[in-house]
Amino acid sequence: MAFTRALSRRLTLMLSAGALLAAMLLCWAALQKHETTLEIRAVSQGATIPDGFSVWHHLDANGIRFKSITPQDDILLIKFDTSDQSEAARKVLYRSLPRGFVIAQQEEKSLTPAWLTRLRHDIQRLG
């Protein structure tokens, strides 16, 4: 009897510790900063994208911090630490760049949104 009581107590403690660890991991994952990326591309075919230095100058003049500015094919990618910085930069660049450019938030390449979408569709098939 004492053996089963001790085993039950240990099992309860181990399950509680596991649940606490899982909750801590979920909280940690939710609090992680996810970088955001703005894309600048020309509307018309053959037009050139603005150079990174001029974009840097406009962002720096408005106190907006960024991680990197990278040209890629016909797109200029600007990475930020937060979505607030990205949104502020988008507003500044719409005001300061000449017309003829599209400034858009780049789609997240994380597997999590696709996984959640797939999970939602699978739940609808149940029952």
UniProtKB/Swiss-Prot annotation:
Reading the lineage from the top rank, the first entry is: Bacteria
Q: How does it sit in the membrane?
A: Single-pass membrane protein
Gene name on record?
A: mzrA
Can you say what this protein is called? Modulator protein MzrA
Its assembly, as annotated, is: Interacts with EnvZ.
Q: Per the annotation, which location comes first and is thus the protein's main one?
A: membrane
Looking at the UniProt record for this protein, which Gene Ontology cellular component terms does it annotate, in alphabetical order? plasma membrane
Per the UniProt topology annotation, the Periplasmic ranges are 32-127
| Tagged with keyword Cell inner membrane | yes
| Places the protein is found | Cell inner membrane
Chain ranges sitting on the Cytoplasmic side read 1-10
Per its record, what are the GO molecular function terms?
protein kinase binding
Keyword Cell inner membrane (UniProt)? yes
List, alphabetically, the NCBIfam families matched. Answer: PRK10629.1 (NF007915)
For this UniProt entry, which segments traverse the membrane?
11-31
Its job: Modulates the activity of the EnvZ/OmpR two-component regulatory system, probably by directly modulating EnvZ enzymatic activity and increasing stability of phosphorylated OmpR.
Q: Name one Pfam family in it.
A: SecD-TM1
Give the similarity note. Answer: Belongs to the MzrA family.
